[in-house]
Amino acid sequence: MTRVKICGVTDTEDRDAVVTAGADAVGIIHGVPVDTPREVDEGTAETIADGVPPFVTSVLVMMPTTVQEAVRRIDRIEPDAVQVHDGLSPAELGALNNRITQDIVAVVEADAPAIEDYATHADALLVDSVDADGGGGTGETHDWERTRDLVDSLDVPIVLAGGLTPENVTEAVETVEPFAVDVASGVESAGGTKDHDAVGRFVRNAKQAPEGAV
């Protein structure tokens, strides 16, 4: 069964709704140099992460410029896993992996030239549609067939993101057969505020896709 991460959770009410809906992971954005309504301050990030129950994964989503910056944020917030957008080279990602106990998800574009190098140092790859600043959450889809090629050719788990909604996630899972799917803007009533009904429909539609999708 395909796993589901709901990203850009900004408060405890949305966190609890995401957990109740059956999502496998809660994404908390902190430490990104881009303008997004989904980023929270350090204290809020700690509070959200601390309240994620057992068997659901809290994921700190960040764009660090140095390994030390990443380690500092991780030590303070104590997430279960880390998602790194932009900023770190494959070698730096490997150095980070050696300094923390959490799994690292590296965000890449499907045609990134260093994708195999990132796959070597990350525990999973998240394939997203990114903007000029390297941030995700664009609401735009990309070439799902290219991402399917990565599923077939790489040994690390592939997470599909970018423009997913309750309406298209079943088709996306059937096409790509990813380890997991990730959504932010596709289940919002406004920037940074989750539509709880949409979250529930997204989780159901992702997990009810044909069994061949994992």
From Swiss-Prot:
Q: In which pathway does it act?
A: Amino-acid biosynthesis; L-tryptophan biosynthesis; L-tryptophan from chorismate: step 3/5
Task: Give the E.C. number(s).
Answer: 5.3.1.24
What Gene Ontology molecular-function terms does this entry list?
phosphoribosylanthranilate isomerase activity
Recorded hits in Gene3D superfamilies, A to Z, give:
Aldolase class I
Name the GO terms of the biological process aspect: L-tryptophan biosynthetic process
Source organism superkingdom: Archaea
Q: Which reaction does it catalyse?
A: N-(5-phospho-beta-D-ribosyl)anthranilate = 1-(2-carboxyphenylamino)-1-deoxy-D-ribulose 5-phosphate
What's in the keyword line of the UniProt record?
A: Amino-acid biosynthesis, Aromatic amino acid biosynthesis, Isomerase, Tryptophan biosynthesis
Q: Identify which top EC class this enzyme belongs to.
A: isomerase
Pfam families linked: PRAI
* Family, as annotated: Belongs to the TrpF family.
**Listed PANTHER family:** N-(5'-PHOSPHORIBOSYL)ANTHRANILATE ISOMERASE
Query: What is the protein name for this chain?
Result: N-(5'-phosphoribosyl)anthranilate isomerase
Q: What is the native source organism of this protein? A: Haloarcula marismortui (strain ATCC 43049 / DSM 3752 / JCM 8966 / VKM B-1809) (Halobacterium marismortui)
